[in-house]
Amino acid sequence: MIGIYFSGTGNTKYCLEKFVALYDRNIEITPLEDEGTIEKVAHHKDIIFAYPIYYSNLPKIVQDFICGNSDVWKGKHIFIIATMGLFSGDGAGVSARLFKRYGAHIWGGLHLKMPDCICDVKALKRTPDQNKQIVIQAEECIKSAVYNLKNGTPTKNGLSFWCHIAGLLGQRLWFYRKTQAYSDKIQINWYVL
């Protein structure tokens, strides 16, 4: 088994590390952007795949990684961990549908609310104490999910038809243009620094 992750702020990496520490400390974890990651994936049948959700969508780097390596997913068993700031509906389901298209079996899914890095949306702003509570709650969810997985009843957050509808109607359609404006052209306002 191997753990693969993308983590913009460190939240997702933290969650995967906690999950692996409770499930099996011998599992190697590696960021999907590392050069040798896809070769490592090819040598493992079971995968824990973790990423953040942006407005109920996959980060472009995650979608590109899954689609760009479509031939490697056939026959893999994948457990998905999706981190989010508030709500995603089908955060795990977004990648699950891609993985299934490429022949993977989805083992389960786990949604974890974590402190958000988006500072221009009032609903996502939290005090440091609130953020600590969010992390504690996420750790409890991880413990529960690991217990369920070890007992043969994996958590299936975000994988149902109704979760898909909730993600689509609750966020993706409303915020579609938010992520379309993202660019690879970095702009730094030095006067702000």
Q: For the regions a protein language model found, what residue spans apply to each?
A:
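Cysteine-centered iron-sulfur cluster-binding motifs in ferredoxin-type domains/subunits
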Residues: I186-L193
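FMN-binding flavodoxin-like domain, especially the glycine-rich phosphate-binding loop
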Residues: I2-G3, S7-C15, F19-E33, T37, ...
